[in-house]
Amino acid sequence: MILLLQLLLGLGYTALAHLASRWHHDGLALGALVLLIAMVVIEPLLARRPWAFIATPLLAWVAWALYAAGHAALPLLLVPVVFVVAIAWLFARTLRAGSVPLITRIVLGIEGGDGPGALEPDLRRYTRNLTAAWAGVLLLMAGANLLLALIASPAGLLESVGVASPLPITQEQWSLWANLLNYGVIGGFFVVEFAFRKRRFPGRYAGFLDFLRKLAGLGPVFWRDLLR
């Protein structure tokens, strides 16, 4: 239930952030920040963690202060960078010695193996390499997000510190990539990789929808523990 609520808040944030950039509207930017804060603190608040009750009003005050100063849209430039880097880290950290790569854990969850040794060596190598590939793709996306945030005009990161953008793009163009097309790249990579994997390891899935059903069948507890 919490994951669903966070997803809805995330979708609301994406919509408001894009509209705020398109229309240069500080009120919508403030609304996007409020939804972002809610998405981050909702779980710890419901778990009654003391730090969340301290952080929430502080974050709300910072958002309002930025709005009052006319800079509510500035943090929105960095959110896609931080978000994508954080996801890349979820993949990359599992590549350390002694850890089970994230994609390997997902495949083990689907196939019911007790550990990496339960997978065929070829499949085990593939899942490790795929984990590294996801981390690499996401880091490249984060770099693109940061570059576009720097050169956006008006009020991009460079212009916010008094440096003229060498190759200006509009805020709407930045937002189109950072808040919308990012997800298209992720979805495209996901679909293309599945098509390749289905040929590389035939007989494991009846089709793409069957694969999605198996992912959903892992349940919220599996996904919560996977991302911790």
What are these regions (language model features)?
Residues 1-35:
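Alpha-helical transmembrane segments and their cytosolic membrane-interface
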Residues 74-134:
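Membrane-proximal helix-loop-helix units in multi-pass membrane proteins
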Residues 115-228:
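C-terminal membrane-adjacent module
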Residues 23-54:
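Glycine/small-residue-rich interface belts in oligomeric ring/scaffold proteins
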Residues 5-8, 12, 34-38, 58-59, ...:
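Lipid-exposed faces of alpha-helical membrane segments in multi-pass integral membrane proteins
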